[in-house]
Amino acid sequence: AVVDKAKEYNVPIRVGVNSGSLEKHIVEKYGKVTAEGLVESALDKVKMIEDMGYDNLVVSIKSSDVLMCARAHELLAPQCTYPLHVGITEAGTLFRGNIKSAIGLGIILNQGIGDTIRVSLTGDPVNEIASAKQILKTLGLRKGGIEVVSCPTCGRTNIDLIGLANEVEKMVTEFDDLDIKVAVMGCVVNGPGEAKEADIGIAGGKGEGLLIKKGQVVR
C-alpha cells in the first residue's frame, strides 16, 4: 500500500536500515551486527521495492558505531545508484554527538559518498543544523557563512579570550551571505602571524590590541 501511494504521487521512499533494528536472520548469519549485514539488509529492501515496479528511492544506513557506519557506506556506495542519506545515529549529547558525527561524516563524505546528511544529537534540533553546516564547510562542501578561528589560551594570554571568541562566534551567525574567515587571537606576539590567513583578525594583549586585515596590522 505504501509503495502504491508513493507511485501515485511520485514521492521518494527512504529505505532505512538501523543497526539497532537489523533483522534477526541477518544478525545470526554474520554472528553479530556488522557493516556487511547492514548493507545486505538495505539492498534486500531496495530489491523488494524495485520488484514492485518503483525506483524513486533514497537509501539510509545508520549505526551508532562510527567505524561500522563508515565501512557500511564504503561497501554500499559501489553497489547502489540511489541517493544516500548519511548520519551517525544515536550519536549522543552535544559534546559527544558532535565529535562522533564529525568523525563519521568526515570519513564518509571525504570519499565522495553521500547526498544528504543529518547530525543526530540529543538536544535542540537547531544545534544539529549548525553542526551539519560546519562539518560541510570544514570539508569544503559548503560555502557561505563566517568561519571563526581562535587560538588556545596560553601563558601569554592577558585577555578573556574564551569569552571574546564565544561572543564573536555568536555575532557572526547572522551573516550566512558572507564567506570570510575571522581570527580571534589571544596575544600580540603570535597573533599577527597566526591571523595572516584570515580576512580579518584581532589580537588582544594587556591593555592593548591589534586589528589585522589580510595579514597586515591596520590598527
Question: Which residues make up each language-model segment?
Answer:
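Conserved, mostly hydrophobic/aromatic
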Residues: 15, 59, 108, 151, ...
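Mg2+-dependent phosphoryl-transfer enzymes with acidic/Ser/Thr/Gly-rich catalytic loops
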Residues: 204-219
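Hydrophobic alpha-helical bundle architecture
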Residues: 164-196
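Catalytic alpha/beta core domains of metabolic enzymes, predominantly
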Residues: 18-21, 26-173
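Conserved structured catalytic cores and adjacent interaction surfaces
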Residues: 125, 154-158, 188-194, 198, ...
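Hydrophobic or amphipathic alpha-helical targeting/insertion segments
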Residues: 1-12
